[in-house]
Curated annotation (Swiss-Prot):
NCBIfam families: argB (TIGR00761). It is found in: Cytoplasm. The lineage of its organism: Bacteria, Bacillati, Actinomycetota, Actinomycetes, Micrococcales. Its main location: cytoplasm. It comes from Clavibacter sepedonicus. This is Acetylglutamate kinase. GO terms for biological process: arginine biosynthetic process via ornithine; L-arginine biosynthetic process. The gene is argB.
Length: 303
């Protein structure tokens, strides 16, 4: 064998050993998560980038065939904004929430259940007939309560915006028991008038569902690497944090990060063993988070 051929053989051997080490590292996590429910909140740039959407679908299918029971909850902010602009409907944000008139809500429902949900289901089902769409309105899955917001010390009316106040996971459990991957859109009937639906935050909806399902983990995809103690100092990235530490840190966080970290806190406080925010811009970040020891992003654990 020539020197060049020997070098190539050595490289192949090293690559094979590296792959084997990665597979063995995943063994303990495969054991831990076997037949366990993992709730994944899909959002951010991953929703509008075709390649990231494709790799997300691959990850979800991988989880399913690896013996986990994944549940996807999605928002649709970018798509909703695009559709409102296309239809010439004015929309504004107050206190970080989209003011939702009845006209806006019809667009929200149309985009979430008729566009985003279908796109996610189609991406997953490219690998087999596995995914099924479920709306938060279906079979009493979510019940919401209207909320306002405080802006500059003044309470403002957000319209048809609410918080999830109760979850009946029966419809989702039925899909899981049938071997399917539920894809859940974040909209909820109003508890005071079930004929009226509310636009609810998808991060909070995912957390509430994770608690109701007794999930092993909540994973929220974001557009940042994780939680920073002192943004924009990239050296302040937090790999893991206890719930009590996060609770104290929460008021000082950037406004865009607060709902996501609050959702992680709600999940852990509700009995979910771990919750994490990860960078959805990195292909296959979900697999790195679940099946490697160091994970990726920021993990929240009980105090």
């Amino acid at each position: 064998m020539t020197a060049i051929a020997q070098q190539a053989a050595d490289r192949d051997q090293a690559q094979a050993e590296s792959k084997a080490a990665i597979l063995i590292e995943s063994l303990s996590w495969l054991q831990r998560f076997h037949d366990r429910i993992v709730v994944v909140k899909f959002g951010g740039n991953a929703m509008v980038d075709e390649e990231l959407t494709r790799t997300f679908a691959e990850d979800v299918v991988y989880l399913r065939y690896a013996g986990l029971r994944p549940v996807v909850v999605h928002g649709g902010g970018p798509q909703i904004s695009a559709m409102l602009t296309r239809l010439g409907i004015d929309s504004e944000f107050r206190g970080g929430y989209r003011v939702t008139t009845p006209e806006v809500l019809e667009v929200v429902r149309m985009v979430l259940t008729g566009q985003v949900s279908r796109d996610v289901v189609r991406g997953i089902n490219a690998h087999g007939p596995l995914a099924a769409a479920v709306s938060g309105e279906d079979a009493g899955l979510f019940t919401g309560r209207r909320r306002g917001a405080v802006v500059d010390g003044v309470e403002v009316d957000l319209g048809l915006v609410g918080d999830v106040v109760s979850v009946d996971p029966t419809a989702v459990l039925a899909q899981l028991d049938a071997g399917r991957i539920p894809v859940v859109s974040s909209i909820a009937p109003d508890e005071s008038d079930p004929a009226v639906s509310l636009n609810v935050n998808a991060d909070a909806a995912a957390a509430a569902l994770a608690v109701a399902l007794g999930a092993e983990k909540l994973v929220i995809l974001t557009d940042v690497a994780g939680l920073y103690r002192d943004w924009p100092d990239r050296g302040s990235l937090v790999s893991d944090i206890r719930a009590d530490e996060l609770r104290a840190l929460l008021p000082s966080l950037e406004s865009g990060m607060i709902p996501k970290m609050a959702a992680c806190l709600e999940a852990v406080d509700g009995g979910v063993p771990k919750a994490a925010i990860i960078d959805g811009r990195i292909p296959h970040s979900m697999l790195l988070e679940i099946f490697t020891t160091n994970g990726i992003g920021t993990e929240v654990v009980p105090a």
